[in-house]
């Protein structure tokens, strides 16, 4: 062994060692004399007696090696058998239970490298003696410590095997050499016959199941009952058999490996997979998908689309008025085709889309929705009392009657019946501006007026696209009469050109008729008609019949009457400039 830079001191060590050996031979060197030697002398004598760097030994069938480290300091490495219960334990476990310094690669290492351990290397380098409280670990001391650790290994292994033997009794001695360990039968029989090692290979399936299956409530299990239970579990599903493969290792060691993975794997993946993915998928995706997507879709969608051509056949481009639907649509939409009527929309529309969803078209759409429930309508009696509900009476009218030849009174009755269908329970009144029998009347237009239960006034008056202030006025009077002048201000600003042209006419018209015709109009308005709601649809009505806002509003508040003018223009409203300024502010 080479000592690097310490070759100069080797001669001195050798001389000292020879003198110590000479004295020991003359004084019959013993243990009591060894204790009197210094640590330096003990290290030199130990190194002379054991000049080799390594010494291999075997105890209880376990091999260990005593080697030199740190220049004349001894250590030991113990090989742990692979089948030992603590083979893969962490290093901390060996430090706590075996007193080892470290554990790595299946070797227990014991080395005294703490500050209290004597080191010849430190003393040689420093030139000063080691601490007096330090102790030197000799070759025999480290060997005894290795033997103690091996005995503890055998003790823990025996305790583990005794727990196994308590369940199944004693068996033959375990031959560790069959599993690749360094144990031998000779060493086991000679050195550790008092240890009960067992042969796992001869125990069979009982021992393997015991090693891998935990106990339940401290009760031992019957092997025959376990076999029956396992046989029943094999007929179950794959998910139930999976934990049994994890806990029981019969297929790994015993002779049952062939039936477990050979014949029994066939029903798991062969016969059971066929009904799962073979036969069951056919009714799920094959036969059941046909009635779901093919047979059911035919009556649902074909009946709806087949009925549409029948609906269109009665309303061809000829427009022969063969049904009440065509007749009423033509009357209410100002001779427009039924196909030009927009679809039903909500009545909660703003002022910006009045031209698209006007009031008569809304009534027309409502009639469109309920026309399917109308019975053949013929001649009906007209109620003289406008407050009574209109009850249509079917008369003898042929299906092929030409409704275009009907008179205005008959058309009026038909419209009344249709409006009664649209608004059941409402008061249906047919109001005529002017006398129908008087040819000199100012207007012969007739309107259907519907008073709903909530007080909403609905009329089927047809007006031109330019007359768009009627719907605007109706919304303001039905919602809030006080907001009419404010919104009228915005409407007048949007029509500056029309308002500027008629500004002179407006003041003259307001001044002349506000004082001359107010009392007459108020008197006529109070006695001429007993209806709760007045509808003035025609723009040809003279301005004498239009009262001022203050007096009419007072009258309306007292008699609960709302006046709606569908042809209201910004220049036709009668108000004072002071009132207009107050509202605009």
From Swiss-Prot:
Biological classification of the source: Viruses, Varidnaviria, Bamfordvirae, Nucleocytoviricota, Megaviricetes
Sequence ranges of Polar residues compositional bias: 209-223, 379-405, 479-488
Segments of skewed composition (Basic residues): 507-525
Designated name of the protein: Uncharacterized protein L397
Bridged cysteine pairs (disulfide): none
Top-level taxon of the source organism: Viruses
Biased composition, class Basic and acidic residues, residue ranges: 490-506
Low complexity bias: start-end ranges: 232-241
Region feature Disordered, mapped onto this chain: 209-244, 377-405, 473-542
């Amino acid at each position: 062994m080479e000592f690097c830079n310490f070759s100069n001191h080797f001669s001195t060590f050798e001389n000292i060692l020879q003198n110590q050996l000479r004295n020991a031979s003359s004084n019959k060197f013993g243990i009591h004399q060894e204790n009197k030697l210094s640590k330096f002398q003990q290290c030199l004598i130990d190194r002379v007696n054991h000049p080799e760097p390594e010494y291999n030994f075997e105890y209880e069938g376990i091999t260990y090696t005593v080697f030199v480290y740190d220049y004349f300091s001894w250590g030991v490495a113990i090989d742990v058998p692979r089948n030992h219960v603590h083979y893969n334990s962490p290093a901390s476990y060996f430090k706590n239970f075996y007193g080892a310094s470290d554990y790595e690669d299946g070797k227990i290492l014991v080395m005294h490298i703490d500050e209290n351990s004597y080191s010849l290397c430190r003393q040689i380098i420093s030139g000063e003696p080691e601490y007096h409280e330090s102790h030197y670990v000799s070759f025999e001391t480290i060997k005894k410590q290795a033997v103690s650790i091996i005995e503890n290994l055998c003790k823990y292994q025996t305790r583990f095997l005794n727990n196994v033997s308590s369940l199944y009794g004693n068996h033959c001695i375990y031959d560790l050499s069959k599993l690749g360990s360094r144990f031998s039968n000779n060493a086991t029989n000679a050195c550790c016959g008092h240890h009960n090692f067992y042969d796992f290979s001869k125990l069979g399936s009982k021992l393997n199941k015991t090693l891998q299956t935990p106990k339940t409530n401290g009760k031992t299990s019957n092997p025959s009952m376990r076999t029956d239970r396992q046989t029943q579990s094999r007929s179950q599903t794959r998910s139930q058999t999976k934990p049994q493969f994890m806990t029981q290792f019969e297929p790994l060691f015993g002779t049952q490996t062939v039936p477990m993975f050979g014949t029994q794997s066939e029903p798991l993946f062969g016969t059971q997979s066929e009904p799962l993915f073979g036969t069951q998928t056919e009714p799920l995706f094959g036969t059941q998908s046909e009635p779901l997507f093919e047979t059911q879709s035919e009556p649902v969608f074909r009946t709806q689309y087949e009925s549409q051509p029948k609906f269109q056949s009665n309303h061809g481009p000829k427009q022969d008025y063969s049904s009440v639907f065509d007749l009423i649509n033509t009357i209410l939409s100002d001779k427009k085709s039924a196909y030009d009527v927009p679809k039903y929309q909500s009545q909660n529309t703003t002022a910006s889309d009045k031209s698209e969803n006007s009031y008569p078209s809304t009534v027309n759409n409502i009639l469109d929705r309920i026309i399917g429930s109308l019975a053949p309508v013929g001649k009906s009696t007209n109620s003289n009392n406008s407050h009574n509900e209109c009850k249509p009476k079917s008369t003898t009218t042929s299906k092929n009657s030409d409704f275009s030849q009907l008179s205005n009174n008959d058309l009026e009755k038909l419209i009344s019946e249709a409006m009664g269908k649209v608004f059941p329970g409402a008061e249906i009144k047919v109001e005529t501006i002017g006398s129908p029998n008087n040819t000199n009347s100012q207007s012969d237009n007739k309107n259907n007026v519907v008073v709903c239960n909530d007080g909403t006034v609905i009329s089927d008056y047809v007006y031109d696209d330019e007359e768009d202030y009627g719907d605007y006025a109706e919304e303001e009077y039905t919602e809030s009469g006080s907001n009419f002048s404010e919104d009228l201000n915005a409407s007048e600003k949007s029509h500056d050109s029309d308002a500027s042209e008629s500004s002179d006419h407006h003041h003259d018209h307001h001044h002349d008729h506000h004082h001359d015709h107010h009392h007459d109009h108020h008197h006529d308005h109070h006695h001429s008609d007993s209806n709760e709601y007045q509808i003035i649809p025609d723009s040809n009505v003279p301005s004498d019949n239009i009262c001022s806002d203050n007096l009419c509003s007072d009258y309306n508040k007292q008699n609960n009457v709302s006046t709606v003018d569908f042809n209201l223009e910004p220049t036709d409203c009668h108000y004072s400039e002071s009132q207009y300024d107050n509202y605009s502010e």
